[in-house]
Amino acid sequence: MAVLEEPFKGIRTVKNFIGGEWVESKGELVDIINPANQKVIGKVPMSTKDELNAAVDAAREAFPSWRRTPPLSRVRVLFRLKELMEEHFEELSRIQTVEHGKTIDESRGETRRGIENVEVATGIPSLMMGYNLEDISAGIDEYVINQPVGVFGIIPPFNFPFMVPLWFIPYAIATGNTVVLKPSPEDPTSQVKVAELAEEAGLPPGVLNLVHGGADVANAMLEHKDIQGIGFVGSTRVGRDIVYRKGGETGKRIIAGTSAKNAVLLMPDIPLDKVIPTLLSSFFGNTGQRCLAGANLIVVGEGLSERAHEEFYKKVVDQFVLSASKIKVGYGLDESVQMGPLRDKGKKARVVSFIEKGIEEGSKLMLDGRKVKLVSDLPHDAFLNPTIFSDGSVETTIGREEIFGPVANIVRARTLNDAIDMIERSPYGNASSIFTNNGGWAREVQYRVTAGNIGVNIAIPAPIAMFPFGGKKASFFGTLHPQGRDAIRFFTDTKVVIQRWM
């Protein structure tokens, strides 16, 4: 299959978008690197605190008039934005592939998921309606109204640079708020394109502002008195220890989606040949760089003798290793490629350190992804192939900590109770899945497992725009989640009006 054309040529320096103007930053410029070929494809500024303050000022000044804009008028802009995103669908997808490294199919899926959030947000004029009750006492009526809050800051991660900001932005805008977005500095260009399209769609100046930068800009957002809330997705260390705590100190509303260690349970009644392809996507899709990635594959021997369980376990390991070894790894713009690189050299080095730790702690390395094999001639700097361990446990380092790379840990559980106990010992609770044809077993997992997302014969319980998305335990900090009705509640303030006319 052909290698697709890259979405832009040369080296482009991205700008800040403040108050409806594209502004060059005075901050230091940092390279944006294509992880597949290690070429510099752009420059991103580390913006100054003054530039962040200017963006917040623009958002604050735009809020009163945007708030007074009729909801139907607000969402007409989103309808137009959705149309423009569809027109630029392929460009948006290719930008993600060259900046992040994911395959073009994965990028197209991310683009579709992001656009779906814009679509759902166009329904907010009815979704944010309040309610009322007449005559709560003689001649007295009571109303609940939902009002916009003000300026919100959005701090998304590198791994889904297009989709995750759209878990927040359309809902904030449709409900009458204004936004300051700090894209990931590693892959910011898809959000630059979104801002360009929003401007073309007729979004008024200051409603959406974009300021590039790193931790300094993020910290300034958390400390800024005029930012009313923060939407963040990233690691537990940053989400809990910095965003949630520092944001709470300044009275901000917080959504902080954080780390994960997801388990996939295989019950002995499953048709393994049908499940393996789904498992490959779960564990190695997006090169394992997603909060829904499979991490621990738990092979359950419920109802089997020890010998039969061991045979089932060996069959799973053998088939999974064989199938994973055939995954085509390379440049994501090659449509034959099934897995791209990690985002950068540092992230590869981190994953390699986990592989070495797994070996050191006694797990059996069945497939060594450090032996890089690509479909074309590319530097190996950020590439790994799928890696699989067996004969370990969920208590080892690779079984316990988030790796964020293409590494699977296959373990045994004699019973379903044992498997659930393994899951519950984890500090994380983002997602768990079970593969079975037994409704009782599936219900037991759904009922008992502490996770924000449960998959039944679905290895990736992916975020769908109509529903809230988020985890539990150390995988989430806050009370409301992005997307769906939770997002509407997060971006609105409830006011009760009790009235009597004399």
Predicted regions and their residues:
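Hydrophobic face of amphipathic alpha-helices that form TPR/SEL1-like repeat modules
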Residues: 1-36, 370
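Residue-level signal for inorganic ion chemistry
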Residues: 38, 74, 96, 118, ...
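Conserved C-terminal structural/oligomerization subdomain of aldehyde/semialdehyde dehydrogenase
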Residues: 39-42, 203, 227, 265, ...
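Glycine-rich loop-to-alpha-helix module at the N-terminal edge of alpha/beta enzyme cores
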Residues: 39-129, 139
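Short, well-ordered beta-strand elements within core beta-sheets of diverse protein domains
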Residues: 41-47, 62-68, 154, 264-266, ...
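Rossmann-like NAD(P) dinucleotide-binding subdomain of oxidoreductase/dehydrogenase enzymes
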Residues: 130-276, 309, 413, 478
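A short hydrophobic/small-residue beta-strand
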Residues: 178-180, 365, 453
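ALDH superfamily catalytic-core signature
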Residues: 229, 237-393, 456, 501
